[in-house]
Amino acid sequence: MGGFCGADRGGFLALLVWLQLLQPLFSGTYKPREDSGVMHRPQRPRRPRSDPEAPAQQSRLKSLSISHPSGVPVSVDRTEIPGSGSPSGTTTKITLENRRSSLGGPFFTDTCGHRITEVDPGSLSAGRKWPWQVSLQSQNEHVCGGSLISHRWVLTAAHCIYEQEEYMVMLGDDMLHSESESVTLVPVQDIIFPSNFDIQTMRNDIALALLYFPVNYSSLIQPVCLPEEPFRVKNGTVCWVTGWGQQNEIDAGFASILLQEVQQRILLQKHCNTLFQRQLGTSKNLVIKGMICGLQDSGQSLCWGDSGNPLVCESDNTWTQVGIMSWGINCNGVPVLSVYTDIAEYNEWVSYVLSQASRMDPMGVLVLYLSLVFPLALLVAL
């Protein structure tokens, strides 16, 4: 009967000891450290509000049927959807239910939302004016935008993610397909989104992408702040959205090479719905709870390929992401209306996802497995 020789047993035991010693180093990736957790702008304590869509337990998906929009008079960037209609096997759903979670301590810091090198407002985005901006890519092509919120997490739109696709995240450069040494490419390990995301109405259009390994912050790569409840951006506030989407409807399928920026004026839902109804000849309210609306009067707008991009507002020299680009109509129209996922509505969900991830310990699971398997192997050898 074959077995392990003495040298083999010694090697196995040595490997097990090394894995146990290295476990804190590897497992530290997920711990909510001050420099690795999602970052929120500090807010004065306020009375919590009742949130009908706080998160619950997560579960692994094998398939989830999501059909393309039908009968909804909005543009949903079909040209950038790479899949056939259901999330991949590496996609996790998290149900939004009437439950709240608390996440405090190191996750809430004030080191986010800052530029290392300032650039004049209104110029093209050279020089990493927006260091949290990332490109979500598939098969070396830009699919959607996103924003870095921690060393290992990227925020984007749920409708960008479809099955049988391997995703990469590009950070550190404003040029797509740049060969600069500043470019960082990181594969995506997992993508998490609300189980009740509805592509018909674009409700709950938010997703979190987990990078395979953490990225280091620099003058080219910085996280953006997220709003804390009950933060609400005021009507008329001037904010900015950035992205590599095509610049007009004529250039279908061609992303901009250089990162673009567009100024947005925040509109109340009621006013936004009135403008949509007037343009589309409908009585339906298309902008619903969980969405915010931006207006650009000049005709410069976002277009296909801009989904998932961050809408950011500045206050006290700190940039906070208030929205995720979700949908809009008529790239070349005036005025241009764009609709964003309201991040403040999903603050608890984001915090819950990251708090659950912080409890994961893949290296610990491996050590446990080896601790069980190796003694059995040694017994067999003996």
Curated annotation (Swiss-Prot):
GO terms for cellular component: plasma membrane; side of membrane. Disulfide bonds join C144-C160, C239-C313, C272-C293, C303-C331. The keyword Hydrolase applies. One of its GO terms (molecular function) is serine-type endopeptidase activity. Residues 30-97 are annotated as: Disordered. InterPro entries: Peptidase_S1_PA, Peptidase_S1_PA_chymotrypsin, Peptidase_S1A, Trypsin_dom, TRYPSIN_HIS. Keywords: Cell membrane, Differentiation, Disulfide bond, Glycoprotein, GPI-anchor, Hydrolase, Lipoprotein, Membrane, Protease, Signal, Spermatogenesis, Transmembrane, Transmembrane helix. It holds the Pfam family Trypsin. It comes from the Eukaryota. Residues 56-68, 85-95 have a biased composition (Polar residues). Testis-specific. Expressed in germ cells at the stages from late pachytene spermatocytes to spermatids. It is found in: Cell membrane. The keyword Cell membrane applies. CDD domains: Tryp_SPc. It is a lipid-anchor; GPI-anchor. Residues 1-27 form the signal peptide. Belongs to the peptidase S1 family. This is Serine protease 43.
